């Protein structure tokens, strides 16, 4: 069972996982260093747990405890209980859904794991986290088999990407390409037809590429 700890001081060192969640550069270094990502909202927390990700801790406003009681009863990690005002002070934004979890980051797929797929979405240098999350959500909804990300593309496990994806980052396979050009060549060698999206009226339809 989780250990509930009421906290009233935003400088408490135990809250380090949740500090300044809107500071992208800070979060990028902190999350990589400590091997974590942040799940925001009860639904996202549940989906992360259902996908097998393990929590490090929780940061909750009191009114969200009962809704997550079954999850909290099943884990042995600290639950930091704070007021909603203090949560905003800690994280740097208003936590609308009042529930955050620090989860253990895992690398679940490599590019080689996706090479038997039929259809893959490839993200070239898409650096906006919400765009990456939206692409993964759309790919999952449209029945694509996975997503490959160029080396410079945004982190799918960054908080805003996870939130925008509605948790589909936990279920749809995705992997990062170590080398952009080499990765495209490998896709072609494995029999994939690589089609780039270009928003010009003169661009051919993907349908025109079928069978080519």
Write out the residue ranges for each language-model feature.
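Single conserved hydrophobic/aromatic residue that forms the stacking wall/gate
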Residues: 201-212
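Boundary-proximal intrinsically disordered activation/regulatory segments immediately upstream
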Residues: 1-62
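Short, aromatic/basic amphipathic alpha-helical patches
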Residues: 67-76
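RNA substrate-binding interface of SAM-dependent RNA methyltransferases
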Residues: 50, 106-200
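Glycine/small-residue-rich loop that forms an oxyanion/phosphate-binding "nest" at active or ligand-binding sites
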Residues: 88
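A glycine-rich helix N-cap at a beta->alpha junction
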Residues: 78-81
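Glycine-rich phosphate-binding loops that contact phosphosugars or nucleotide phosphates
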Residues: 101
């Amino acid at each position: 069972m989780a250990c509930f700890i009421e906290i009233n001081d935003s400088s408490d060192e135990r809250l380090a996982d949740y500090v300044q969640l809107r500071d992208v550069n800070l979060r990028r270094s902190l999350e990589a260093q400590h091997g974590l990502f942040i799940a925001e909202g009860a639904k996202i927390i549940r989906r992360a747990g259902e996908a097998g990700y393990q929590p490090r801790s929780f940061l909750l406003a009191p009114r969200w405890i009962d809704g997550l009681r079954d999850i909290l009863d099943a884990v042995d990690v600290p639950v930091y209980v704070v007021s909603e005002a203090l949560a905003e002070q800690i994280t740097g934004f208003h936590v609308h859904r009042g529930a955050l979890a620090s989860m253990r980051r895992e690398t679940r797929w490599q590019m080689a794991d996706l090479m038997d797929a039929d259809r893959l979405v490839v993200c070239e240098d898409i650096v906006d986290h919400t765009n990456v999350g939206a692409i993964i959500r759309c790919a999952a909804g449209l029945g694509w088999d996975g997503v490959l990300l160029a080396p410079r593309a945004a982190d799918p496990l960054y908080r805003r990407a996870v939130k925008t994806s509605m948790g589909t980052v936990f279920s749809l396979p995705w992997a990062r390409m170590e080398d952009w050009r080499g990765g495209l060549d490998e896709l072609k060698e494995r029999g994939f037809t690589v089609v780039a999206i270009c928003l010009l009226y003169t661009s051919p339809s993907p349908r025109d590429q079928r069978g080519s």
